C-alpha cells in the first residue's frame, strides 16, 4: 500500500534555546560508545526501528555497518539505567557546515512512558554543541513515535522544512 508520509526537519541554533530535561535519577547515564561497536548500532536500529518502519539499513552487511560506525564524523551515545541499555543517539558532524545532525535517536520500548525521550534529546543536543557548531538538526516523520515531534519542539527546536513523501509501507 502506498502511503503519504509527512517529514519534518527541525533545528536548534544555540544551546541557550534548549529547554533541557534533567536526568530522571542518578541511575541514568549517557555514555559515548568507545571503542565503536557496530553490533550496538545495528541492535538499536533494528529494535527501535522495527516499530517505525526503519528499513534502509536492514540489508546492510556487517562490513557496511563497520564502515558506517568507523566514520570519524559519527559519534554514538547510549543511555543506560545502571548497566542496562535503554536508548541511543547517533550524531553526524558536518565540519564544513559547522553543524551536527541527530541521525538516529530512540528508546527501547520497555522504557516507553518513563519521560526519558526529553532527557535523551537534551543530551544529544548538548553533546552536539560541545563541538563548537552553529546548528543541530534532525528530521522526523509521521511514522515515528507519536510524541517525537512534540518532544523536538518542546526542547526548543524549530521547524525549517516540511515535505510529503509517498512510499510503500509493508
Where are these predicted regions, by residue range?
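Acyl-donor-binding surface of acyltransferase catalytic domains
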Residues: 1-29, 34
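Short amphipathic alpha-helix that is part of the acyltransferase structural core
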Residues: 22-57
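A conserved beta-strand-loop-helix scaffold within acyl/acetyltransferase catalytic domains
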Residues: 58-60, 72-76, 80-99, 103-107
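Short acidic/polar active-site loop segments enriched in Thr and Asp
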Residues: 75, 134, 158
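Short hydrophobic beta-strand segments in globular cytosolic domains
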Residues: 86, 159-160
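Conserved glycine-rich acetyl-CoA-binding loop
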Residues: 108-122, 131, 143-147
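Conserved beta-strand-loop-alpha-helix junction that forms the acyl-donor binding cleft
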Residues: 112, 138-148, 160, 165-170
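Conserved GNAT acetyl-CoA-binding A-motif
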Residues: 128-140
Amino acid at each position: 500500500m502506498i502511503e503519504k508520509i509527512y517529514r519534518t526537519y527541525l533545528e536548534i541554533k544555540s544551546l541557550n534555546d534548549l529547554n533541557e530535561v534533567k536526568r530522571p535519577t542518578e541511575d541514568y547515564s549517557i555514555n559515548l560508545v568507545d571503542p565503536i561497536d557496530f553490533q550496538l548500532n545495528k541492535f538499536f536500529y533494528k529494535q527501535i526501528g522495527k516499530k517505525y518502519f526503519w528499513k534502509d539499513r536492514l540489508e546492510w552487511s556487517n562490513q557496511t555497518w563497520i564502515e558506517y560506525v568507523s566514520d570519524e564524523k559519527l559519534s554514538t551515545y547510549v543511555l543506560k539505567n545502571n548497566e542496562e541499555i535503554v536508548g541511543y543517539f547517533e550524531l553526524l558532524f558536518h565540519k564544513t557546515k559547522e553543524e551536527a545532525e541527530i541521525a538516529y535517536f530512540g528508546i527501547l520500548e520497555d522504557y516507553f512512558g518513563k519521560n526519558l525521550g526529553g532527557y535523551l534529546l537534551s543530551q544529544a543536543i548538548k553533546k552536539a554543541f560541545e563541538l563548537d557548531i552553529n546548528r543541530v538538526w534532525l528530521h522526523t516523520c509521521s511514522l515515528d513515535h507519536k510524541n517525537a515531534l512534540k518532544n523536538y519542539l518542546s526542547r526548543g527546536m524549530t521547524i525549517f522544512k516540511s515535505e510529503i513523501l509517498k512510499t510503500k509501507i509493508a
